[in-house]
């Protein structure tokens, strides 16, 4: 089998974002193949662990993927502050004699946004509403490359490297089977260090608040971090829900139109016509949602928002939440099938370099700077007695279960499959045991 067939069979997906199936993303021709090893979110250290401990695998997979898509340029983008990680990668490149370049980036947020990386590495800007492939670039997360290397050895994607951090007693990088409960992951890191906490899956800026006792409280293919955070602080409000009327009332009463949200918006700095202050103004004085969305102007440009949260967590002096409004509008536009017109090219703003937000400053602003880091090369392996693997692991079609209650499975047994070439990913058993439930999850008990 070729590389595409191997990653499809193994069920490899993107590990750093929405979980887009890798066999679909890599089925392309491009001039550039970029490995996103920036890991720009505060607290997350998973990719750093992988670079230190699996550099040879990452470089090998990078070279193979670049050759497959015909890329003349294979690049690993990493923060220049990651000295040990860069040294490990450079040694792996030298040992392999690989034509892979290490690109050093400054520590700013969100340096790991794929459109930011494309510009920083290639000098090209992705068109509004476009994807990196529009400018001849394919970007994949470093953890995806590690999973692709495993797939080359015909090992399915059934284990996740995850940072467990925040208000825990022993922050750690863990390796957990898909479907492991979040509560078990937290216990592996010494348990919560405070009584009244909530959990975020992902990074503090773009991660999602989850319930530990629900299906959402399980390790999936896209789980990069599990953060335990105390209630009562900024992060609880930042991750809380708010309806449109509440957002409109706050915008009407408190927005001073200072435009800081727009001036610091990473997508606006790349030249995109995304202007959060104009969206806030429109929302404040619109009669209803229909009126707000009727014109193809500033409001529909909310679809360009990456939801990085710079506007809400850092820029706004009034404590307003433009990113939540953008998220609401994006979801509503998708539900109604509304798309902004145009896919225009962009030119970065001349003062972009001076408006980048340092990662350390945003970490202090949101209250995560004082939490301890993980032990550098320690890895905790979790072996749960039961897993519940959700059929929905990312975009596309749901895989169809090929097992039934009562079936015995081993790690790597195919339990749900997608049609050949479909947008979606195969699922495999992550532990040995008996299938006890097949619904929107496949539950396996050891």
Task: Give residue spans per PLM region.
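Hydrophobic alpha-helical positions that pack around
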Residues: 75, 80-184, 188-195, 200-204, ...
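Beta-strand/loop-dominated core regions that host nucleotide or nucleotide-derived cofactor-binding catalytic loops
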Residues: 195-204, 214, 222-229, 287, ...
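Flanking helices and flexible, charged tails adjoining ferredoxin-like Fe-S electron-transfer domains
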Residues: 16, 43-44, 123, 290-292, ...
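Short, well-ordered loop/turn sites that connect or cap secondary structure elements
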Residues: 176, 220, 403-409
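Conserved phosphate/anionic-ligand binding catalytic regions in large, soluble enzymes, centered on
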Residues: 11-27, 313, 423
